[in-house]
Amino acid sequence: VTDRIWRSAQPAPRHLRALAARGVRTVINLRGAHPYGAYWLEQQECARLGLDLVDIKLKSRAAPTVADLARIREAIAAIDGPTLIHCKSGSDRTGLFCGLYLILREGVPVAEARRQLGLRYGHIRMTKTGVLDHFFDHYLEHNAREPIAFTTWLDTVYDPAALTASFRSGRWHRRAARGRGLGQRCARSQP
């Protein structure tokens, strides 16, 4: 993402050791605290290495709530030093967070920052996770009609329910919901 912000899928303890050796001081886990083995291993290894572990539970197939965005903004404001950001696959939730980081901390334009949600990272827009792309698109559409700063839009205009309704009315979501998304089309084209 930047020279101080890295993204990944769920790290194993050996990955955390390698990152700590490279100077990473904070790990932001977008899966939230949970009782599964991967989280327990991550928690134990972060404690052993002296890494700060920040847990934020986000959903990959739902518009971020106002509370989600408040937690994300708080975490972004608190980043001080090399940081790893991850979810399960490093694609969807991580892409949303990294895009927001670039906008809020680095001043990157929204149209550029939204590229953190891309096929390069394993994110596929034409599935239910496309709601995260729609989040950025929704702002860009509003800003084209009525110019507004991104943070002002978040604070005064953003409505997760309206965003979700708008996304569900879209063509790609309807195809994915009926099982006719990209995966089904690719499967049908195989000999």
How would you name each of these model-derived features?
Residues G90:
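Substrate/cofactor-recognition hotspot
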Residues C87:
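Short cysteine clusters
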Residues V1-T83, L96-P191:
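Cys-dependent protein tyrosine phosphatase-like superfamily
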